[in-house]
């Protein structure tokens, strides 16, 4: 069975009906909406771009918002799944808490020889030992039980309220779970750059893509 929970604060009723219609004819799929605003009252969300909104932070708190769940896949809404997502759910994390795809865009920024600001930000400001192993936060598989044992809501709140983060939830996940993450197959988070480079991206893309990520100037959330 597939239990899909949409975390939101302003989806209109008409769009909710459209989303719910996606499960028509499927008896093993449930789609529900979780209104998050009431649970976020004490947080002050720092956003470094108009492209981002407070929804960007929700993934950090989902294990606490869903106390009866032990494990889950958390993904952005600007993704298209092109295979059975259950294959990712049963990915063996071993002793790790989280699984995600290595952020190859970040690696490019880290290797910028003319501007060392990104490398300095990750190693000195965030204190991440090896930023080249950072994973992209757009799609992750998370062991909720292990996560809650390691990370308190107060610790998450401290980072949300007091740090000026560039990639917000992704940065916090990588800070708190460094050494406890598994890098999974790149096909689970294949980014499509919707600008001039799109033809090159398609030409170089893996023949089998499981998940497409549409990165654009304006996120749909």
Predicted segments — roles?
Residues 10-18, 108-109:
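Short, charged/polar "capping" segments at the starts of alpha-helices
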Residues 44-46, 90-157:
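Conserved catalytic core of nucleotide-sugar-dependent glycosyltransferases
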Residues 42-54, 113-116, 198-204:
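Short, surface-exposed amphipathic charged segments that create phosphate/polyanion-binding patches used
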Residues 14-65:
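Active-site-proximal specificity loops/subdomain of glycosyltransferases
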Residues 2-10, 100-102:
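Short internal beta-strands
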Residues 130-131, 136-221:
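A glycosyltransferase accessory/donor-loop signature
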Residues 3-5, 32, 73, 182:
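A structural signal for isolated positions on well-ordered beta-strands in alpha/beta enzyme cores
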Residues 33-39, 57-112, 141-142, 148:
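GT-A fold catalytic core of metal-dependent nucleotide-sugar glycosyltransferases
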């Amino acid at each position: 069975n597939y239990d899909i929970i949409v975390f939101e604060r302003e989806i209109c009723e008409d769009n909710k009906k459209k989303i719910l219609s996606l499960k028509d004819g499927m008896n093993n799929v449930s789609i529900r909406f979780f209104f998050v605003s009431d649970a976020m009252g004490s947080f002050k969300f720092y956003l470094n771009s108009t492209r981002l909104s407070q929804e960007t932070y929700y993934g950090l708190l989902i294990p606490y918002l869903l106390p009866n769940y032990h494990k889950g896949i958390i993904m952005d809404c600007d993704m298209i799944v092109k295979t059975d997502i259950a294959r990712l759910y049963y990915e063996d994390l071993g002793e790790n808490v989280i699984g995600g795809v290595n952020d190859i865009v970040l690696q490019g920024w880290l290797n910028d020889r003319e501007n060392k600001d990104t490398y300095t930000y990750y190693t000195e400001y965030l204190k991440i030992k090896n930023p080249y192993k950072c994973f992209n936060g757009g799609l992750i598989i998370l062991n909720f039980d292990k996560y809650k044992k390691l990370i308190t809501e107060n610790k998450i709140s401290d980072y949300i309220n007091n740090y000026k983060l560039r990639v917000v939830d992704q940065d916090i996940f990588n800070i708190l779970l460094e050494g406890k993450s598994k890098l999974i197959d790149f096909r689970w988070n294949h980014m499509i750059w919707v600008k001039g480079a799109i033809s090159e991206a398609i030409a170089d893309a893996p023949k089998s893509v499981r998940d497409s990520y549409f990165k654009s100037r304006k996120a749909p959330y």
